[in-house]
């Protein structure tokens, strides 16, 4: 499988290497839950390969995600602190995340969002990002999807061990093993990360260090019952403990900067796949249990919660002819949460179908419909249409792509419960489901030598957006109008001469809430500019990435300062199987703010070694 890194062309490099192939042949799964070559996909997708993930070397997955077009990340004070991953300017809780098919959303969270701050990069083999309203396959509330795949087994036995250390007394160790034969295969990973961190809050005069520990275990076991039937089990356990400032004792309400956040998520999935002739069937059941506890100077604080998510899914495909494929499925889910004061549970049923057709040999279209029945908010029907048209241009192809999608989001269990215990005006409000729609139009030019250029315009909006009352803190209110997000994504990947390659993206994002004001913490302009140099066969490689964010405002409407952050990565294959690697994050020691009141990491160097067998 060839590597694809989506990025924008700030400049089209001359001296393009004569080596490489068209990147339109890369196989993508996230768009329609079935493998499809990029050339046939009309939606906007990007991917990070195993090589790219390892070379960049970041400890947390959100650090990798922020290098991609259309993705903005805000972090509140270092590793393990709350981090929002926004796709195309939408709220972080509209971003859905899956690991080996497991939905890792937390029903006890404010709006049932994934806890990205506890999601580490160790053991991750591939990440695919689907941008825009994507409710068809993943639930009508999905405003973007991040599909994460861990390392898979191959014939025989293989593995790796890795250790790294660096600034803030940070250390990371991990191990991966995989093996199998024609009948049985397995893969397992274990990783431990520790850091003393830095002072997370700018107003904490004690200047204490807020550390974080994370232990992540992940395993998968597969059994080929017959040539057509496969059984697979996935299980994971994540435990995180972080220090932070500015918390309150739940009994005395005393303020403290000695605060602890304990997090644990246990999840598993069992799946059965059957393929025969023109039909395939996938039936799966997954369960996750997420628990969060907060302490102030050793005593209970606020924000505790436990959430459980059960999901039963069926996906089928029928290849009706050489040019026509049908995808259909069922999605049954139960959300439950308990915060110690109240507990709630809700069921939702979803049914969907999508037509995929190849017309005129170079026109690929999809048309899908989804029906959801929410226990509290009734039935909703949503749609998705997409198309990709290919034509030869020079020594390559141009793809004209377009997509349109709709969705809805029912108020979360937390939002409903908060309003029931709040006060006017929120307590007097009957929250309704949000509705969304969006479209994008784009051009892609992919040359046979590896040059990849993409330009996409997107426009999407949310009707009746739910938001927290920051004026009176009464609870959750509902906007009487549309919140909008539109803009342009530019992407470029170019092999250059003398071992150099260019990797860049730029996003312009114009957002407004239902009052016409810019939405908070969404930079109008984001860019990543990466340059990498590697020797023949990549015995040694070094890369530089510059990340910039401009024209953002805070929740008060106050402008946030623009910034640029420079990261450096290097990797040296000493002998077969042994790599020494290092990186410097924030090379220029930029003093920048993502969320007012919270500090960001200064210049930090890390060194490590990896042995593969």
Predicted features along the sequence, with ranges:
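Extracytoplasmic beta-strand/coil segments of soluble accessory domains associated
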Residues: 62, 66-103, 125
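Outer-membrane beta-barrel signature, preferentially recognizing the C-terminal barrel domain
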Residues: 250-275, 305-308, 344, 399, ...
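Structural signature of Gram-negative outer-membrane beta-barrels, strongest in the C-terminal barrel
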Residues: 223-226, 236, 273, 319-327, ...
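Short acidic/polar hinge/loop motifs at secondary-structure boundaries
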Residues: 103-131, 428-430
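N-terminal periplasmic accessory domains that precede
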Residues: 61-64, 83-86, 95-98, 114-119, ...
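Periplasmic-side early beta-strands and strand-to-turn transitions of outer-membrane beta-barrels
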Residues: 145-149, 153-157, 164-168, 176-263
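Conserved C-terminal beta-signal and adjacent last beta-strands/turns
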Residues: 4-7, 178-179, 189, 215, ...
């Amino acid at each position: 499988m060839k590597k694809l890194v989506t990025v924008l062309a700030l400049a089209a490099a001359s001296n393009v290497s004569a080596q490489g192939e068209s990147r339109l042949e890369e196989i993508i799964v996230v768009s329609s839950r079935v493998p499809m070559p990029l050339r046939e996909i009309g939606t906007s997708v990007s991917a990070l390969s195993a090589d790219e993930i390892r070379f960049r070397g970041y400890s947390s997955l959100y650090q990798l995600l922020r290098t991609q077009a259309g993705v903005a990340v805000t972090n509140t004070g270092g590793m393990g602190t709350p981090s929002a991953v926004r796709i195309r300017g939408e709220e972080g809780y509209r971003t859905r995340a899956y690991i080996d098919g497991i939905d890792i959303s937390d029903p006890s969270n404010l709006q049932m969002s994934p806890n990205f701050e506890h999601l580490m990069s160790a053991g991750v083999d591939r990440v695919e990002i689907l941008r825009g309203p994507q409710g068809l396959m993943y639930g009508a509330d999905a405003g973007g999807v991040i599909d994460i795949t861990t390392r898979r087994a191959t014939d025989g036995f293989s593995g790796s061990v890795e250790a790294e250390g660096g600034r803030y007394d940070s250390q990371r160790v991990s191990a991966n093993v995989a093996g199998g034969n024609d009948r049985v295969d397995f893969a397992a990973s274990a990783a431990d990360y520790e850091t003393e961190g830095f002072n997370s809050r700018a107003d904490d005069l004690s200047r204490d260090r807020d550390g974080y520990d994370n232990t992540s275990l992940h395993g998968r076991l597969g059994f080929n019952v017959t040539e057509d039937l496969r059984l697979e089990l996935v299980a994971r356990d994540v435990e995180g403990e972080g220090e932070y400032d500015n918390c309150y004792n739940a009994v005395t309400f005393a303020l403290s900067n000695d605060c602890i956040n304990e997090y644990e998520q246990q999840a598993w999935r069992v799946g059965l796949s059957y393929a025969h002739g023109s039909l395939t069937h996938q039936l799966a059941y997954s369960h996750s249990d997420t628990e969060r506890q907060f302490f102030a100077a050793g005593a209970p604080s606020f924000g505790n919660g436990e959430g459980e998510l059960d999901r039963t899914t069926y996906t089928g495909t029928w290849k009706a002819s050489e040019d026509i494929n049908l995808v259909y499925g069922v999605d049954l889910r139960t959300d439950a949460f308990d915060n110690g004061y109240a507990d709630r549970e809700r069921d939702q049923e979803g049914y969907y179908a999508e037509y995929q057709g190849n017309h005129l040999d170079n026109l690929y279209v999809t048309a899908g419909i989804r029906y959801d029945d929410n226990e509290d908010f009734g039935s909703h029907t949503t749609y998705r249409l997409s198309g990709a048209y290919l034509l030869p241009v020079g020594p390559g192809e141009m793809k004209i792509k377009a997509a349109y999608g709709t969705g809805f989001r029912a108020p979360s269990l937390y939002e409903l419960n908060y309003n029931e215990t709040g006060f006017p005006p929120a307590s007097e409000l009957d929250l309704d489901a949000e509705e969304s729609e969006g479209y994008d139009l784009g051009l892609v030019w992919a040359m046979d030598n590896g040059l990849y250029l993409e330009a996409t315009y997107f426009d999407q909006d949310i009707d009746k957006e739910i938001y927290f009352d920051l004026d009176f803190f009464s609870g959750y209110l509902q906007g009487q109008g549309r919140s909008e997000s539109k803009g342009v994504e530019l992407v470029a990947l170019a092999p250059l001469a003398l071992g150099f390659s260019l990797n860049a993206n730029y996003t312009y994002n114009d957002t407004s809430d239902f009052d016409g004001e810019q939405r908070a913490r969404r930079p109008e302009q984001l860019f990543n500019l990466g340059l990498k140099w590697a020797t023949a066969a990549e015995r040694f490689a070094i890369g530089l990435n510059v990340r910039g964010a401009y024209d953002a405002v805070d929740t008060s409407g106050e402008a946030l300062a623009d910034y640029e952050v420079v990261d450096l990565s290097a990797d040296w294959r000493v002998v077969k199987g042994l790599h020494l690697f290092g990186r410097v994050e924030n090379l220029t020691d930029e003093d920048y703010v993502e969320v007012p009141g919270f500090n960001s990491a200064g210049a930090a160097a890390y060194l490590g070694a990896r042995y593969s067998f």
